[in-house]
Amino acid sequence: MKPLFLLASSSLLAVALVACGGSGTSVAPVAAPTELAAVHTPPPDYPIELACAGIGGVSTLKVVVGIEGIPTEIGVFKSSGQPALDEAARKAVHGWQFKAATRNGQPVSQTIQVPVNFTPPQERPNQCFALDSQRQG
């Protein structure tokens, strides 16, 4: 009785595999998508004239990160109101590096918005005194 049960079970399994589309060939697994990740994002150079004047702001940039993980397009999405801060933000982001997002195991470009904050220093930088002397002198 047991051999007959095993034979019937094996036959049912084979029929079930064929019915489910199992042909014995394996299908390559689909790679899970990954998201864009920042790798190297050094801060921007703060324009000394604005730092000395205590002027800050936020420049929000629209950045296209290419498949190599580097910014390929950088534009100002929302200005800080200070062109020098916006330009400093653009220059900084131009040198940033990312790990590109992937879809189906392949890197893809992605567009993101990046806020770059400029907060004036608590204490006046030493360079400010040199600028003051140049202006007076």
Cite the ranges covered by each PLM segment.
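Bacterial N-terminal signal peptides that target proteins for export
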Residues: 1-11
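C-terminal motif of bacterial Sec signal peptides marking the signal peptidase cleavage site
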Residues: 16-19
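Bacterial signal peptide processing site
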Residues: 21-24
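Short proline/glycine- and basic residue-enriched helix-capping loop/turn segments at helix->loop/beta transitions
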Residues: 28-64, 88-135
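Residue-level structural signal for beta-strand termini and adjacent loop
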Residues: 76-77, 113
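A short acidic/small-residue loop/turn micro-motif
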Residues: 78-83
